[in-house]
A protein has these predicted regions:
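Active-site-adjacent beta-strand/loop module that shapes the phosphate/pyrophosphate-binding cleft
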Residues: 82-85, 90-115
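Conserved Nudix-box catalytic region and its N-terminal flanking loop in Nudix hydrolases
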Residues: 21-73
Length: 157
């Protein structure tokens, strides 16, 4: 497959905290990347979705705050939840089994409202402490991201 090396998918993920526990979800076996593995809510940018937003420039198509828009949309779609203001945790790049590179921006946010209601992309969920999350078959790096959020929360007091 000849891919333009400059092109990447862009994805966002959100570690959602509620009462000292974090939402983890199990990916459907039909997913292209990491089927059956545990993760946190998130997903890829889809141009047709943010193009529905009003452009912030009269001269050309341009949109501000698209990362937060996509993050909130993915959390709502995958888990049925609303979140507080998301905060940046880290980023990474991985290459999917089909050869496409994905830039992932990881955030955390406190649960604001709603009860977990999974969509077709996820098959199970759990609210787990960082220690409890170690017992799940998490995608590489998710445990470390959860532990980073625990450190951030401790620093915030």
């Amino acid at each position: 497959m000849d891919l333009d090396p400059r092109l990447h998918f862009v994805a966002v993920t959100c570690i959602i905290e509620k009462g000292g526990k974090f939402l983890i979800t199990k990916r459907s076996l039909n997913e292209k990347a990491f089927p059956g593995k545990w993760t946190v809510p998130g997903g890829k940018f889809v141009r047709s979705e943010y193009e529905k937003l009003p452009s912030t420039s009269p001269l050309y198509p341009q949109w501000y705050n698209v990362v937060e828009f996509v993050l909130r949309k993915e959390v709502r779609e995958e888990a049925g939840l609303e979140i507080e203001k998301p905060e940046y945790v880290t980023d990474l790049v991985f290459v999917r089994p089909d050869g496409y590179p994905v830039v992932t921006l990881s955030f955390w946010a406190r649960h604001k409202s709603g009860e977990v209601k999974l969509n077709h992309e996820m098959s199970e969920f759990a609210w787990a402490t960082a220690e409890e999350a170690k017992r799940y078959d998490l995608i590489d790096g998710i445990q470390e991201e959860i532990e980073e959020v625990v450190k951030l929360l401790k620093r915030q007091g």
